[in-house]
Amino acid sequence: MKGLFSAAALSLAVGQASAHYIFQQLSINGNQFPVYQYIRKNTNYNSPVTDLTSDDLRCNVGAQGAGTDTVTVKAGDQFTFTLDTPVYHQGPISIYMSKAPGAASDYDGSGGWFKIKDWGPTFNADGTATWDMAGSYTYNIPTCIPDGDYLLRIQSLAIHNPWPAGIPQFYISCAQITVTGGGNGNPGPTALIPGAFKDTDPGYTVNIYTNFHNYTVPGPEVFSCNGGGSNPPPPVSSSTPATTTLVTSTRTTSSTSSASTPASTGGCTVAKWGQCGGNGYTGCTTCAAGSTCSKQNDYYSQCL
């Protein structure tokens, strides 16, 4: 019995590890720093945030400035966010910044956020779309923003389980930075988080498996020091489809005792590997035939 329990626990751990991820390491100009030295450490392991009204959408569950160092960077410096494992779920990657009124370590992110970068889908000539599902993401601090302390936020919006049967997942981390050598730009437009994302946004509700021909990343327009303007959605390729690298993982499952399945909501079902429960979760709770809603932690239950 003990052996069976251990095997079941290992199976769940493998399933969770292969499906979830966290941005945990920051690099500046190629210099990689220790895990969580400059990134606020969350308390929900690598689980996502799904509640659009939660303050956890800012920097993740339990992520605090206290105990996190703040790194000094120059405007224009290159930065990289590295994950514990490559992004596993389809969806856009976005980077935001919010200027702290004082020290970044004391800032709760309740002010305005402006977006500096989106990675959206590439639509190929064969009618498919590919996403940049990488193990790290690199961009540059805008050269024109004012000096001072900022929160630098990266977000993966996973839309692999189409709404409303499924619910999109936000994988988030915030780094604390002090910008020097900047300018007198006025970054914007800005949006509050929570509030920047709505369950009516086409980029939130889209079904990426059916008639998926265009996409707009949720959130405000991307800020540019060259007078603003967003990065437009990638156009449909008229020639050779884009080349992508497929990240594969092996999932192992076995029969196991699972958490009680919550009451069904409206007769909808969640596909295998999708989220079916957890603190703050308001989506569908009934798993598709052949899978069972299993509690991974207080924040996430998954159809296995």
Curated annotation (Swiss-Prot):
Gene3D superfamilies: 2.70.50.70. It is an enzyme of class 1 (oxidoreductase). This is AA9 family lytic polysaccharide monooxygenase G. Its main location: secreted. Residues 225-265 are annotated as: Disordered. Residues 268-304 form the CBM1 domain. Glycans are attached at N214. It comes from Thermothielavioides terrestris (strain ATCC 38088 / NRRL 8126). Keywords: Carbohydrate metabolism, Cellulose degradation, Copper, Disulfide bond, Glycoprotein, Metal-binding, Monooxygenase, Oxidoreductase, Polysaccharide degradation, Secreted, Signal. Has a modular structure: an endo-beta-1,4-glucanase catalytic module at the N-terminus, a linker rich in serines and threonines, and a C-terminal carbohydrate-binding module (CBM). The genes for catalytic modules and CBMs seem to have evolved separately and have been linked by gene fusion. GO terms for cellular component: extracellular region. Its EC number is 1.14.99.56. Residues 1-19 form the signal peptide. Cu(2+) binds at H20, H89, Y171. Binds 1 copper ion per subunit. One of its GO terms (biological process) is cellulose catabolic process. SUPFAM superfamilies: Cellulose-binding domain. Transmembrane segments: none annotated. Disulfide bonds join C59-C174, C144-C225. Lytic polysaccharide monooxygenase (LPMO) that depolymerizes crystalline and amorphous polysaccharides via the oxidation of scissile alpha- or beta-(1-4)-glycosidic bonds, yielding C1 and C4 oxidation products. Catalysis by LPMOs requires the reduction of the active-site copper from Cu(II) to Cu(I) by a reducing agent and H(2)O(2) or O(2) as a cosubstrate. Shows endoglucanase activity on tamarind xyloglucan, as well as on beechwood xylan when combined with phosphoric acid swollen cellulose (PASC). It catalyses: [(1->4)-beta-D-glucosyl]n+m + reduced acceptor + O2 = 4-dehydro-beta-D-glucosyl-[(1->4)-beta-D-glucosyl]n-1 + [(1->4)-beta-D-glucosyl]m + acceptor + H2O. Belongs to the polysaccharide monooxygenase AA9 family. CDD domains: LPMO_AA9 (cd21175). It is found in: Secreted. Its cofactor is Cu(2+).
